[in-house]
A protein has these predicted regions:
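A short, gly/pro- and small-residue-rich
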Residues: 141-162
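Catalytic-core regions built around general acid/base machinery
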Residues: 36-48, 147-151
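Active-site phosphate-binding/coordination module
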Residues: 46-124
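Single conserved hydrophobic/aromatic residue that forms the stacking wall/gate
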Residues: 163-174
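Asp-based phosphoryl-transfer active-site loop
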Residues: 12-33
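Short, well-ordered secondary-structure micro-motifs within conserved domains or adaptor modules
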Residues: 126-143
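Short acidic low-complexity segments
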Residues: 9-11, 119-130
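Structural motif
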Residues: 20-22, 103, 130-135, 159
């Protein structure tokens, strides 16, 4: 069945109680706010709508993102920012025993989230991790990538938080 969205004259804050807003390109672009985004968010909050923020960026702490949003004049607590690191750590924790070893390749935020779920962060395949979580990390080395490969080859669950772009005429993704 193909459902069509219907238009309405009612403000969105009267139709929905919660807005999950993507950050990158919706609320801000890099360090700069998207024009009118903060005003619209404040209006929705004044009308009683709860606002939460989501991002697939695994490299920044929730508190850092919340601070940036407060700089735009928004009332935001870190718990209102849902990063891919938060989701990944919780997801893996549901699929492995408490205290399980997890090889983490990513920013400190990702490592902290995994440890915060009661899991043991390791750096080497020889530590026999039950899972691997790889986030965006521009400082990763060939050795770290090799450790990820070895762990996955040995049967570790693999979760990547890295966005793979859609192929274009110039891209080849295998």
């Amino acid at each position: 069945m193909n459902a069509m969205l219907k238009s309405t004259d009612r403000p969105i804050s009267q139709t929905y109680r919660l807005a999950l807003l993507d950050l990158d390109g919706v609320v801000y672009r890099g360090k700069n706010p998207v024009e009118h985004a903060a005003d619209s968010i404040r209006a929705a909050q004044r009308a009683g709508m709860q606002v939460e923020y989501t991002t697939n960026n695994s490299s920044r702490f929730q508190r850092v993102v919340a601070e940036q949003l407060r700089g735009f004049g928004l009332d935001v607590e870190p718990r209102q920012v849902i990063t891919s690191s938060v989701v990944a750590a919780r997801m893996v924790a549901r699929h492995v025993p408490a205290g399980a070893r997890i090889l983490v390749l990513g920013a400190e935020h990702l490592r902290e989230e995994v440890a915060g779920q009661g899991l043991t962060v390791v750096d080497h395949a020889e530590d026999t991790p039950e899972a691997v979580i790889q986030g965006w990390y521009p400082d990763m080395t060939w050795q770290q990538m090799a450790e990820v490969s070895y762990a996955v080859e040995r049967g570790a669950l693999y979760l990547s938080l890295i966005h793979i772009p859609e192929p274009t005429r110039l891209d080849v993704i295998s």
